[in-house]
A protein has these predicted regions:
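Proline- and Ser/Thr-rich low-complexity, intrinsically disordered segments
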Residues: 1-43
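Von Willebrand factor type D
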Residues: 28-165
Length: 165
């Protein structure tokens, strides 16, 4: 079973566990619509490798080939964290990707959590196995910037119960 306390999540390494999440609140917008789509994932392999064999760090700055609108802001660059997080705060580039999370979420005070898209954002360890890469799929105006954390094990759970996002 998964054990959750205010500052810790313990996931067992001896079998499969299904994780679900409930999103609380959102920012209203007049320009986005949400609709269900069929599950057709992009490739988990290929792309441009980053953070090869490095745990708990942010990538260098990655320039997007298009403008990305996120909560009313326009971004053209990002950084990717080894713990399944993408940030538009370029001050994080090549820095420590904070773990553990010591602040409540949501927060307006912790830099790692500002202006970011979180996968599950948890402590995974690409220093042991797996890969992190990014790629652009599609053609304008329907392009996608895709980041893959492929078969990366959980930190301190190196028997390779793997994570793919």
């Amino acid at each position: 079973s998964v054990t959750v306390t205010p500052n810790n999540v313990n996931i067992p390494c001896n079998g499969c566990t299904t994780l679900t999440a409930t999103v609380q609140g959102s920012v209203a917008t007049t320009s986005y619509s949400v609709a269900p789509t069929a599950y057709t994932p992009y490739s988990f392999t290929g792309g441009t490798p980053i953070l090869v064999n490095i745990d708990d760090t942010w990538s260098g700055v990655i320039t997007l080939p298009f403008c990305f609108q996120f909560y009313g802001q326009t971004y053209t660059q990002c950084v990717i964290g080894s713990n399944a997080i993408v940030s538009f705060d370029l001050a994080n580039a090549n820095m420590y990707n904070t773990w553990p999370i010591s602040a409540a979420i949501p927060t307006n005070t912790v830099g790692d959590m500002m202006n970011c898209i979180m996968g599950p954002w948890h402590d995974i360890d690409p220093g042991v196995a797996g890969s992190i890469s990014w790629a652009i799929y599609g053609t304008a105006p329907c392009r996608a910037f895709v980041v893959s954390w492929n078969v990366v094990p959980m930190f301190s759970c190196n028997n390779l119960k793997l994570f793919r996002y």
